[in-house]
């Protein structure tokens, strides 16, 4: 039995190594020796893909070297087989790290005494929804005629993890090789098949994948439970999720939100004029020509005037005057943007980050028109020029609108026209990670409108990088009226270069950049002049696009150059996980969408405030993620041992729990100022404030009210309003017993008890239930055990959640003018039917009737079941009717 208060440990199946043991091997699956490789051809090969669609693609592509495959099985149990190989697939992750158990062998309780939960060895469990698929894959892997296994899961960390967790949970010890695919075209699959990688080559990436998984598990589970324990210490269950990537991402948003909330606008003025010349009119804006940038004053700009008198004076002395015009023209060039990686594509494509990823995945996997999308590289391998030429030729021969631009690239030669070239901005082995940039494959397919938009972006970018720079002529025009200067800027496209691919033409300026011409020394008359009243604006809230950019470039927040380099490549999370991180923050209600903007909610701000109070820098700073990514990269290259990395993670996990526990203990002894309001019960001045309560200081007065209600802290201002006015609200941020958020007002009743007040008639929809309100724990007809509570108006079964009853099914205490007793309510839940209840009153006829109540736990619907009438009464009625006839 584990001593109370000790860290939780887990046992593990034989054959699974301890990731922290110094003597542990770094790979469970034995490495293929020359002898085993020679024996590969004697039996069959099992090929495991990550998804069923990839399994089907492999069966078609590999039919050329291995022979035609026959489809076997049906429904979800389909796999492909021929004389040489069997092809099956996972459905994403099939296996997960096991949740820890408590000291008594039951679920781990939510209290500090069992934290930190650090397993001696990590154990695996099937994911329940995918267990049938796992059994099928393992059944094939254990067949005696299978003598080697090829990992054909997605080429990256997660693909390694999915495959190796399957091997480990099944204790499969057969030689393994790796199929590393850059795209899903037949040629790419065949090329990868001809150059299978050994397990030894993949060992370092496998170690990094497992470390990523286990460290996220340790930090996420322990931080979430520690913060939840802290926030629930006054009652309720206020789950507070935290994690390695999620919390630092939230911190970026929270910092911006704090800037916005603290922002105070500063008024300023601008003077705008319209000038007339022989060829027409042009606008101008007054500037201070002596202005110099001041880093200590970011609000200062050359056109801003900080007092109205100065602005009015400028207008007065320039009104109706004539100025002298001078111009300066400069040539500017703009090079084509680099090829897309996933983050850049998600930022620029017109859909949500999650939506863009789903579209890109469909273009890759379903339609096979682009290469692997979950990449963090914007470069191609240096030996990929022949592939690029072939892809460009296929686009040129297609009926795509951009085909003519692809033809121009293929036909080009000199530097000033589009042509294929080996620029380091395109081809660089040092900048290619697991995968290269997203480019088209040259294949075409029928796409939806949304898919076509994203595909067009990728194709145009692929062609544009081989075009020369766009060249502009930048014009800066100054109009001087004695000591006052007005500035006007314009820009015209001279040579479109790569912008030609996007439909731009030379000699054209956009509306605001177009300037009427002036001759040398020409005068300009002031035809209109005005003073504009402006205010400085707060920083813009993050959008998904700008947040993705901040996540990718979080290295800018770090001073350490080596860590910043890792962050520049990976940032917070990876390209494949950033969209899920944003969606996770939204699902947990830490942030919310408001049009394109992302707002941080009150609970999100409170979490970051809590993390800062605990001084856990790694959870509110990108430094920890940069440190982890740097070390995981080292591990991928064989420069860091797996056990050394995990030792640091365990130390960090202990630190998180220790600091959370200490803050909870310190809070008990914290002194608070009195609440300067009279006691609502006895009228004595001032209420004592503790960590948990507001209470009267008079020894003979029993008034006491909780500071934390339904998982929400009642602020001093809110408490003062409640105790003086007997009501406050409505307030947001409450959470029910099952962590469902709700809004409500609070009232202090005649007995000085705090109650919820709801705007609608459904006053008990989100009631916070206590153990004092529990009337029984019963077993339903289907064998499930549930707790039944009572409130003033209803009986509640919180475990039975439906779409209409997200806070749990409720049964009214009064149904058709009849009170339902607790005994009948328990019987209704236990058997699905009450005894006959007499005295219901029909709302329609106003007549009384007797009936059983019935209960359907699936939807919470209450019905009536009418008892049969006595036979003799029915017979007598029939006889009477006959006599009347």
Where are these predicted regions, by residue range?
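C-terminal or mid-to-C-terminal helical accessory/interaction module adjacent to the motor/catalytic core
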Residues: 143-144, 188-275, 330
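Basic, low-complexity terminal or inter-domain segments flanking catalytic cores
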Residues: 39, 43-46, 130, 141, ...
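Hydrophobic, low-acid, alpha-helix-prone terminal segments
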Residues: 19-25
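Glycine-centered, phosphate/nucleic-acid-interacting loop/turn motifs that mediate DNA/RNA or nucleotide
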Residues: 367-368, 589
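Metal- or metallocofactor-binding catalytic centers and their adjacent structured scaffolds
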Residues: 295-338
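Intrinsic low-complexity, disordered N-terminal segments enriched in polar/charged/small residues
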Residues: 8-10, 34
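Intrinsically disordered, low-complexity regulatory segments
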Residues: 34-213, 217-221, 354, 424, ...
């Amino acid at each position: 039995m584990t001593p109370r208060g000790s860290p939780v440990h887990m046992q593990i199946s034989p054959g699974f190594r301890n990731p922290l043991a110094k003597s542990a091997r770094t790979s469970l699956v034995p490495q293929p020796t020359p002898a085993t490789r020679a024996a590969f051809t004697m039996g069959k090969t099992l090929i495991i893909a990550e998804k069923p669609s990839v399994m089907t693609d492999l069966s078609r592509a590999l039919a050329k070297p291995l022979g035609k495959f026959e489809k076997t099985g049906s429904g979800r149990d389909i796999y492909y087989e021929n004389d040489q190989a069997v092809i099956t697939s996972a459905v994403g992750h099939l296996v997960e790290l096991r949740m820890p158990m408590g000291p008594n062998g039951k679920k781990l309780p939510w209290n500090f005494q069992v934290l930190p939960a650090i397993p001696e060895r990590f154990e695996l469990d099937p994911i329940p929804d995918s267990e049938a698929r796992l059994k099928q894959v393992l059944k094939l892997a254990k067949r005696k005629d299978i003598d080697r296994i090829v990992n054909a899961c997605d080429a990256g960390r997660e693909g390694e993890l999915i495959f190796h967790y399957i091997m480990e949970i099944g204790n499969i010890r057969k030689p393994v090789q790796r199929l590393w695919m850059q795209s899903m075209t037949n040629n790419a699959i065949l090329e990868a098949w001809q150059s299978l990688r050994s397990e030894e080559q993949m060992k370092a990436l496998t170690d990094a994948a497992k470390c990523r998984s286990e460290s996220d598990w340790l930090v996420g589970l322990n931080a979430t439970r520690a913060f939840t324990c802290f926030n629930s210490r006054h009652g309720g269950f206020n789950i507070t999720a935290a994690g390695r990537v999620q919390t630092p991402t939230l911190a970026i948003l929270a910092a911006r939100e704090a800037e916005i909330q603290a922002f105070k606008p500063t008024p300023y003025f601008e003077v705008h004029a319209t000038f007339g010349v022989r060829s027409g009119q042009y606008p101008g804006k007054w500037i201070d020509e002596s202005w110099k940038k001041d880093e200590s004053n970011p609000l200062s700009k050359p056109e801003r005037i900080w007092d109205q008198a100065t602005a009015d004076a400028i207008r007065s002395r320039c009104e109706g005057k004539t100025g002298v015009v001078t111009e300066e023209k400069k040539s500017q060039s703009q090079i084509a943007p680099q090829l897309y990686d996933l983050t850049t594509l998600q930022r620029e494509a017109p859909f949500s980050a999650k939506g863009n990823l789903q579209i890109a995945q469909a273009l890759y996997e379903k339609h096979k028109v682009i290469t692997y999308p979950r990449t963090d590289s914007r470069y191609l391998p240096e030996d990929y020029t022949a592939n690029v030429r072939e892809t460009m030729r296929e686009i040129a021969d297609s009926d795509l609108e951009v085909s003519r631009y692809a033809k121009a690239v293929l036909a080009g030669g000199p530097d000033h026209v589009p042509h294929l070239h080996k620029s380091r901005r395109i081809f660089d082995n040092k900048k290619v990670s697991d995968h290269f940039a997203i480019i088209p494959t040259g294949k075409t397919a029928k796409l939806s409108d949304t898919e076509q938009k994203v595909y067009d972006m990728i194709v145009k970018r692929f062609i544009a990088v081989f075009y020369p720079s766009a060249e502009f002529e930048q014009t800066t025009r100054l109009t001087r009226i004695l000591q006052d200067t007005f500035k006007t800027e314009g820009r015209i496209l001279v040579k479109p270069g790569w912008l030609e691919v996007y439909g731009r033409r030379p000699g054209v300026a956009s509306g605001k950049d177009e300037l009427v011409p002036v001759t040398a020394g020409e005068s300009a008359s002031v035809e209109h002049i005005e003073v504009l009243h402006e205010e400085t604006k707060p920083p813009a809230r993050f959008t998904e696009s700008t947040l993705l950019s901040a996540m990718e470039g979080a290295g800018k927040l770090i001073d350490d150059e080596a860590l910043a380099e890792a962050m520049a490549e990976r940032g917070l999370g990876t390209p494949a996980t950033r969209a899920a991180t944003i969606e996770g923050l939204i699902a947990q209600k830490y942030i919310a969408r408001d049009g394109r903007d992302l707002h941080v909610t009150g609970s999100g701000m409170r979490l970051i405030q809590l993390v800062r109070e605990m001084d856990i820098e790694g959870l509110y700073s990108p430094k920890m993620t940069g440190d982890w990514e740097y070390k995981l990269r080292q591990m991928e290259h064989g420069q860091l041992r797996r056990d050394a990395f995990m030792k640091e993670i365990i130390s960090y996990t202990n630190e998180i729990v220790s600091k959370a526990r200490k803050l909870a203990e310190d809070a008990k002894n914290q002194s608070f100022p009195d609440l300067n309001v009279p006691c609502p019960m006895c009228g004595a001045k001032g209420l004592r404030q503790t960590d948990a309560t507001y209470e009267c200081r008079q020894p003979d007065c029993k008034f006491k009210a909780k500071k934390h209600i339904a998982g929400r802290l009642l602020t001093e201002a809110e408490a003062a309003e409640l105790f003086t006015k007997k009501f406050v609200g409505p307030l947001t941020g409450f959470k029910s017993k099952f962590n469902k958020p709700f809004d409500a007002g609070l009232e202090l009743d005649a007995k000085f008890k705090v109650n919820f007040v709801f705007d609608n008639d459904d006053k008990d929809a989100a009631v916070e239930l206590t153990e004092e309100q529990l009337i029984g724990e019963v077993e339903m007809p289907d064998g499930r055990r549930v707790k039944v509570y009572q409130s003033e108006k209803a009986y509640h079964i919180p475990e039975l959640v439906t779409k209409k009853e997200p806070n749990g099914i409720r049964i009214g205490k009064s149904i058709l003018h009849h009170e339902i007793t607790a005994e009948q309510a328990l019987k209704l839940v236990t058997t699905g039917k009450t005894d006959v209840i007499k005295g219901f009153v029909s709302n329609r006829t106003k007549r009384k009737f007797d009936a059983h109540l019935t209960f359907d736990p699936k939807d919470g619907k209450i019905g009536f079941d009418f008892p049969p009438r006595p036979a003799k009464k029915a017979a007598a009625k029939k006889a009477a009717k006959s006599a009347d006839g």
